[in-house]
Amino acid sequence: MEFTAKANFVRVSPQKARLVLDLIKGQRVEDALNTLLFTKKGIAPAIYKLVHSAMDNANYLSNEKGLDLDLDRLYVKKAIANDGPRMKRIRPAPMGRAFRYQRRISHIEISLAEKPGFQGSTATTVEDEAPKAKGAKGAKAKKAPAKKAAAKKAPAKKFAGKKTAKR
C-alpha cells in the first residue's frame, strides 16, 4: 500500500526541487530524512517536512485500517515535482522599458511504500559474518592469469618533409 503527501504551490522551480528529490528516491525513510537534514539546498527543509508528513499519514492510516505496518520498512517509492502555474513579473529596464520574467511554482508529491522482506536494520551481525569467513578460507584462491610479454614497437619514421626545387 502507498502512502502519499503532497505540497502544492511551493515557491521553487521544479528543476531545483528535482535535484533534491533525486537524492532520496528509493531510500529508506530514515536515510532520506538524514540526507535531507544535511542537504544545503533551500528546498530541503520543505521536502523534509513533506516526507515526515507522508510518514505520519502512513502511521495514521495503518492504525485506522488495522494494518500491520512497520515504519522501519518504509521507503520512498515515488518523489516527483510537477510544474505549477507561473507568476509573471516585470523587471525595470533602461530607457523606460520593462523586461518580463516568470517565477516558477511546483507541486511536489512523495509516496512511501513498505518494502517486502526488508529487515529494519542494514547492519550485519557477527553471526552472519561467521559462515562467510569459513567459506572464503575453504575455497582455493585462484591465481591471476600470466601476463603476456608486451610487444616492442618499432621506432617511428622521421618525416623528411616536402622538398622544393631551388631556382
UniProtKB/Swiss-Prot annotation:
Keyword Ribonucleoprotein: yes
GO CC field: cytosolic large ribosomal subunit
Family: Belongs to the universal ribosomal protein uL22 family.
Region (Disordered): 120-167
Any one of the GO BP annotations: translation
Subunit architecture: Part of the 50S ribosomal subunit.
GO MF, any single term: rRNA binding
Keywords: Ribonucleoprotein, Ribosomal protein, RNA-binding, rRNA-binding
CDD domains: Ribosomal_L22
Basic residues: bias regions: 134-167
Function: This protein binds specifically to 23S rRNA; its binding is stimulated by other ribosomal proteins, e.g. L4, L17, and L20. It is important during the early stages of 50S assembly. It makes multiple contacts with different domains of the 23S rRNA in the assembled 50S subunit and ribosome.
Disulphides: none
InterPro entries: Ribosomal_uL22, Ribosomal_uL22_bac/chlpt-type, Ribosomal_uL22_bac/org-type, Ribosomal_uL22_sf
Full protein name: Large ribosomal subunit protein uL22
A Pfam family reported for this protein in Swiss-Prot or TrEMBL: Ribosomal_L22
